[in-house]
Amino acid sequence: MLMTDIIAKKRDGGELTAEEIGFVIDGYTRGEVPDYQVSALLMAIVWRGMTRRETYDLTMAMVRSGDVLDLSSISGVKADKHSTGGVGDKTSLCLLPMVATQGVRMAKMSGRGLGHTGGTLDKLESFAGFKCGLTLEGFFRQVEETGFAIAGQTANLDPADKKLYALRDVTGTVRSMPLIVSSIMSKKLAAGADVIVLDVKCGGGAFMKTEAEARELAREMVEIGKLNGRRTVACITDMDQPLGNAVGNALEVAEALALLRGEYGGDLLELCLTLGSCILTEAGAASGEAEAREKLLDSIKSGAALEKFADFVRSQGGDAREVYEPSLLPQAPVQLEVPAPSSGYVNHIDAMGVGLVSMHLGGGRATKESEIDLSVGLVLHRKLADAVEAGESLATIHARDEESARRAVQQLAAAYEIGPERPERPPFVRDIIR
C-alpha cells in the first residue's frame, strides 16, 4: 500500500477503505509516515470530506493506536463528560461532584487551556498542591473511593490524536467535521466510560459558530458512541456569551464553589442540571429528567456536592481548606472596573473577545509553552439583555499590574455592544440529541 495512492484517492473524491485508513494511522503513530504526507491527506479530507463510514473507521483506527482503559474493576456505572470548549466553562468542577453524590462514578481525563478557552486542569491547579498527574492505578482507585477523578491524559491514550491534532493546528486543517468528530470520540471511547455526555457549544465563543454545525457534529458523535455500545447523549448549548460571570482560573473556581454552596445559579446551574440529568437517566440513577434535576439540586442544598468536591481536592493533594474559604485562592493585586459608555441594554458580548482579554492578562496560553497566572481574569456584572446606566460597571478586571489592567479595560469595553432596545435572550439549551 502506498501513501501517495491514498492521498491521490482522497484528493479525487474517493472513499478510503478501513484498511487504507488503518495503514495511515498506524504508520503515522509509529513514525513511519512523514508529516508532509499526512498533511497532504488532511487537506484533501478538509476539501473532499469523509463519508460516515470513513469517519467511523478513522475514529476506531485512532482508538486502536494506544491503550483503551478497562474500567470494569470500578464498581457501578462509569460516566464521562466532554465539552467542545468555550469561555468561562467551569462546568466539570460543579457537575462531577453533583453527579458523584448519586452513585454514578465520573472518570474524566482533561486537558489544559489554549488560546481563548480555559482548561480544567489549569483551573484545578488554583488549589495549592493539587496534582493533575495520577498513575492509572491511582486514577482508578480515586474514582472508586471518591466517586470521581479529573486527571491529565495518560501518555499512551490515543497517541494518534496527539500527533494529528498538533499537525492540524499548524497546517490549517482544524476545521473539518470528520477530523473533529474522530478527535473527540477516539479520546472518549479510549477512556472507557459506559455513559458519554457531550456538551456541544455553538456561537461566537465556540468552535462551532452556527447551530446547524453544532447539530451535525452532535449527531455524528452520538452515532459513533452508540455503534460502540456506549450510552451517548449530546446537548447543544449557547456560547454567544461567556458561561457564568467569571473568566480566569481561580475566579472560575470561586464561582464553581459558590454554585456548590447554593449561592450562584444562572446559565451555569442550568447547564449542570441539563448535563447531569442526562447522565443520571442514562446511568439508570433516575427515572427521568424531573427526578434527576431534583436529586442534583438536593446535592447542593444538603451540602453533599461541596463535601464531595472537598474530598476530591484532598485526594489529589490539594488544600481542601480553600474549598470552604475561597479567599485563600490566588488573588490578583490590581482590580479595575469597566464603566458602561452609555445607558441602555447589553445587545451583544463578543465571547471570544472576552476570552482573549483573559488570555492577554496572563490567564491563558498563546502557545503550549506559555506560563499562566492563575489569579488574573475578569468578572462580568452585565450579560446579554441586562440593563445598564452610563458609568455603571460592566465588569471587574483582575490583573497583575496597573498597565495590563488599563489595557484590559479598553479591550473588554470593546467586547460589549449597548443599545436602546432590550434584545431577546436566546434559549440556552438549544437541543438534546440521543
Question: What kind of region is each of these model predictions?
Answer:
Residues 5, 10, 15-17, 28, ...:
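Well-ordered secondary-structure scaffolds
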Residues 144-193:
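Phosphate/diphosphate-binding glycine-rich loops and adjacent basic-rich segments that engage nucleotide
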Residues 123-149, 219-225, 229:
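A glycine-rich helix N-cap at a beta->alpha junction
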Residues 109, 143, 151-154, 184, ...:
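Short beta-strand segments
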Residues 77-116:
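Glycine/serine-rich anion-binding loops at beta->alpha junctions
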Residues 47, 93-106, 187-192, 227-228, ...:
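Alpha-helix C-terminal capping segments
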Residues 1-88, 101, 308-315, 319, ...:
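Acidic, glycine/proline-rich low-complexity segments that act as flexible tails and inter-domain linkers
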Residues 3-5, 120, 161-169, 202:
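Gly-rich Lys/Arg/Thr-decorated short loops/hinges at beta-loop-alpha junctions or inter-strand turns
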